[in-house]
UniProtKB/Swiss-Prot annotation:
The protein's name in its UniProt record: Ketol-acid reductoisomerase (NADP(+))
GO biological process, alphabetically ordered: isoleucine biosynthetic process; L-valine biosynthetic process
Chain ranges of the KARI C-terminal knotted domain: 209-353, 354-486
Family under the similarity heading: Belongs to the ketol-acid reductoisomerase family.
Taxonomic path: Bacteria, Pseudomonadati, Pseudomonadota, Gammaproteobacteria, Alteromonadales
Keyword Isomerase attributed: no
Pathway named in the protein's UniProt entry: Amino-acid biosynthesis; L-isoleucine biosynthesis; L-isoleucine from 2-oxobutanoate: step 2/4; Amino-acid biosynthesis; L-valine biosynthesis; L-valine from pyruvate: step 2/4
Amino acid sequence: MSNYFNTLSLREKLGQLGKCRFMKREEFNDGCNFIKDWNIVIVGCGAQGLNQGLNMRDSGLNISYTLRDAAISEKRQSWQWATENGFTVGSYAELIPQADLVLNLTPDKQHTSAVTAVMPLMKQGATLAYSHGFNIVEEGMQIRSDITVVMVAPKCPGTEVREEYKRGFGVPTLIAVHPENDPQGNGLAIAKAYASATGGDRAGVLESSFIAEVKSDLMGEQTILCGMLQTAAVLGHKQLIAQGMDAAYARKLLQYGLETTTEGLKHGGITNMMDRLSNPAKILAFDMAEELKVILRPLFQKHMDDIIEGRFSATMMADWANDDVNLLTWRAETAETSFEKSPECDTEISEQEYYDKGIFVVAMIKAGVELAFDAMVDSGIINASAYYESLHETPLIANCIARNMLHEMNVVISDTAEYGNYLFTHAAVPLLADYTASLTLEQLGEGLKESSNNVDNARLIEVNEAIRSHGVEVIGKELRGYMTDMKKIASAK
């Protein structure tokens, strides 16, 4: 197999990268009826597999799970989750031949082996679905010509897919049809129905392409979503304790500070997050973010270039073939950081304190979101896709750190995301070491001591305008408006 993206002409590449359309609510009036009577078999029962399946069953669909023989005979975690939730579980040979729709929700690393195993068993004219297109785009998996291939990619971890559905809402979702595999011309109808069954249509659906999803997803998770959050936690903690702050308090300030400040990001973008700071702190955080962007821009651009040209995938797959030596080494190194090893702290910190003392955290988040967004858009990815893969998902990942530190984040994200995160962090931490060492305790985690809120009016206006006019803020305001409207519709029902 060879990288599918690299087989396309420049015109085809740009066309696929730039494919992105926010779908109208009326396009989902038929809900999931198109696949209502289908036999739907999910391959794998991890976080996405289980939670998507629960949502789809609650939407009235016929769902069962197929697992490897060893997973069934040894009653592994995937078997336990499926059976404990009352689903039919069977082997590939038992369930795949009767399936109208097969959802491949195994870990990225297992996609080739899973699809290779199930494809010969799939009946003529069946549909194969993914929630991430890495196997198609980067590994170049060739699917039988009679099989329709679609993608439905919720823009959050699997647990959140379920929780939002239970609240009567859903999570923004990207759908796509593989242009090489739509023999009956009904791929889009299938993808729409699948997305509706998971609750995605309640939050907003983007019609995109496999290529745009993969390239933007890889960039987001490597840089702002995981890499910058981990870098902020590791470097921030190291410098705070070096300047005399209690290790446990520093851990709490960062662990929950990342969650609190990105919660502000979720509701009103970078503008709202920055507005939670005092005027002097806002200007300081803005200036720090600009300095960080100068240092980090070449690294972000390198990651984007490596993703677009396939070098990242080749490097990661070489590590797969080498028994994950690099990934496991970086995972072990992360566990040994002072942030991860520090004890818990029971000192109360108010919501506003996290902002007041989080100037460094806010600057890192602002710089990371804007750099990731810009790198994607500069590569031909449409701004809506870039928004979802940068700003939108950041609070969801920060929630994982709040639950159980960096370990939780790296367990919940995909194997592909974990590798990319370590790759970025491994470069970013030494790159920022001198810069963070030059910061004062006020900048890092104590907050400004001056009581005056006085600033130069012209400078404040200039900073506010720069924050609000960035591309991620412009498209973000529009997309959050769509989601708010849709949430009202869902609540009314």
